[in-house]
Amino acid sequence: MNETTRTYDVIVIGGGPVGENVAERVRAAGLSTVVVERELLGGECSFWACDPSKALLRPVVARADASRVPGLDPAVAGPLDVERVLAHRDRMSSYWKDEDQAEWLNSVSVDLIRGHGRLTGPKQVAVQTPEGDTVVLTARHAVAVSTGTRATLPPIPGLDTARPWTSREATTADKVPGRLAVVGGGVVAVEMATAWQGLGSQVTMLVLDNGLLERMEPFAGELVTDTLREAGVDIRFNTTVTSLDREGGQDGEVRITLSDGGQLAADEILLATGRAPQTRDVGLESVGLTPGDWLAVDDTFQVTGVDGGWLYAVGDVNHRALMTHQGKYQARIAGTVIGARAKGEPIHDAPWGAHVATADHAAVPQVVFTTPEIASVGLTSREAEQSGRRIEVVDYDLARVAGAHQYGEDYRGRARMLIDTDRNTVVGVTFAGPGVGELVHSATIAVAGEVPLDRLWHAVPAFPTLGEVWLRLLETYRG
């Protein structure tokens, strides 16, 4: 077992999309940089979340959309080619190999050390390599923790022997389970229920709450509920799992006991019950922090409670916005501010300045890839009410937009825009309906840009597109 030492300007622990982008921005500022990664470069999003899940969902959603188009509906009535769908999923996940990411990291002159990195003190990281060697790293300026999150499992009796799916197994399974139970009602739960039901599984959703997608506008979850039920998904609200038992060994069915005393049998069970930070074993105790905690940060991503301003936490691990695109935004901010501080340059930390992540508080976009799609940015009406602002809620039936008529028959959807009446700007938008994911960036620009409604009135939408809903929302507001 060998021990070596190296010194860099910046050390990044975690080589997912966030860590890669921190490293690239820091290197662009002229600082020497190393990424430490214990699994695959590209992280959860590339191999176990965003990419494989959307590859499973795309043919399911595309078939649903095509079935509404006159003339196409008979052509798409049959079952999907599961083998080809899974092969496409494998390609989109690069067959769980990260050579391309490693080549990209090398192309931007960032070093890579494969192994488990742990903080051992201020600006110090020890890496245990797969070969059993130790590499002791010292940072001249900063260490950035970008280790992401892991699935959390509730303490259900029988959990260990039931071998439940988490999101990782749900996105990488090599066959369609005959019966799939999904515990949860959030984004992972509804997307995986959509995907596997569309691929031929009989899905039952066991939901603790009164509805799906409870953090979004109520109509979003209601529309998804209706469509899932029409597709054959059995959704049971106000339901908890009290015990699990997998009978007959590894391939046996799972017996699920429910809070009402009833039982359910499934071939697989997915627990989509939340995320926790990957901080249990990264050496937080060596710098006075608690292992397993989320890392609290300021708007430049310096970790609070650690002296010296050298420790940063970027991406899901800081619990600000658990989405890859927002983590990459944070990475661009963090990498830039680390470079500026290392050079002694002024820090522009006013709202919307170059060195602060103001959008984390005001303009986080999200798309849920179900049928129908859900897209949102900014505040919901519930959040707006809690904020104490004077808000006017503007709703519009998306089915009344000409572009929806072209999209297909029996289009169902809804749009909601929240207006801050004191500032005359948009502070939140939610769309629900087929194809609305591509509308979210226009909404993000309106919210992040704080575009006055009088100016937004001059942004003319093309006819006949779904984007014409912007005009209809503004007309509804203006009266």
What are these regions (language model features)?
Residues N2-G16, V176-G186:
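Beta1/beta-strand and adjacent pyrophosphate-binding region of the FAD-binding site
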Residues N2-R6, C45-V136, R140, M216-T242, ...:
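N-terminal Rossmann-like dinucleotide/flavin-binding domain of flavoprotein oxidoreductases
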Residues R6-Y8, G132-A142, S259-E268, D307:
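Core beta-strand elements of the Rossmann-like FAD/NAD(P) dinucleotide-binding domain
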Residues I11-E39, D51, A55, P59-A62, ...:
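Flexible, glycine-rich terminal cap/loop adjacent to redox cofactors
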Residues C50, T147-Q202, I235, E285-D307:
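Glycine-rich dinucleotide-binding loop and its adjacent helix/turn
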Residues A75-V76, D111-R114, R118-P130, L199-D299, ...:
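A Rossmann-like FAD-binding core segment of flavoenzymes
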Residues R91-D98, T172, P177-A181, V187-G248, ...:
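Rossmann-like dinucleotide-binding cores of NAD(P)H-dependent redox enzymes
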Residues D160-V176, Q263-E345, D349-G353:
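FAD-site-proximal beta/loop scaffold in flavoenzymes
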